[in-house]
Amino acid sequence: MVLINGVAVVAVKKKEPIVIGPIEYVKVTGHHGEARVKGKVDTGASRTSVDVWLAANIGLGPTVDVAKVKSAFLDEVRTRPLVRGVVEIAGVRFALPVTVNDRSDMRYPVLVGMDILKSGRFLIDPTKRAPKYASKTQKVDPHPA
């Protein structure tokens, strides 16, 4: 405690941000289970997005609204369902609405957007590699053959 102009000030240590890379393991939890999959961290995406197959498999939902999403590659706005879900990245859990989209032609079934990144808990290091997968949670292949 320090006295400044006669006022007691308690120094509070700010929590250090958690350093994450551009690709991280993400746990997504729904009504029927959970899955740990690799997800892409995207500072250009306003919302977190989950592949439609993965969302159905673990029971994300119900649909709470629709979101208008502008594609980075196409000059058009599309609507996507917003469903309730729980997303965990680097040990931090977020209960939030996520968009559901067909990501079968994309490398990662989850896109972590600014709705999570704005929490201020993360620092993104583009040189950091995704951690090795080590968990008792069963991995789910988001796009089975």
Describe these PLM feature segments:
Residues V2-A145:
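Pepsin/retropepsin-fold aspartyl endopeptidases
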